[in-house]
Amino acid sequence: MVGTAIASFFGMLAISTIYGLAHTFIAKSLSEKISQAWAHRSARFMILVIIAIQGISAFILYGSSLYLLYQGATFTPYTSDYGTLYDGSEDITVAWIVFGLSMAVSVVADIIKVILVLTFAD
């Protein structure tokens, strides 16, 4: 399971990198509107609150995902009394689910931020 956990880690890293590059491209194309929206105090406050929520939740969920990958990689396989083999793949699957939830929170937060920027831009 160590190989699967390492491959999953690099897969998660690649997905995060691709999302970060797309985010950078969108931010550059909206830079003028972001500057206009930043002039409004209420927009600035709402955007900062969303950024804080996004950062805290992403940190917790991504950290949980990495911990689950670690658990799956270091799991000692065993067979139950009913013949089912437990090998740690459940932890790796749950890690992917938690990572997907983390990415979903980031996407929703970024969509809300874009809506706020476009609403408050002059």
Where do the protein language model's features map onto the residues?
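Transmembrane alpha-helical segments in integral membrane proteins
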Residues: 19-26, 102-121
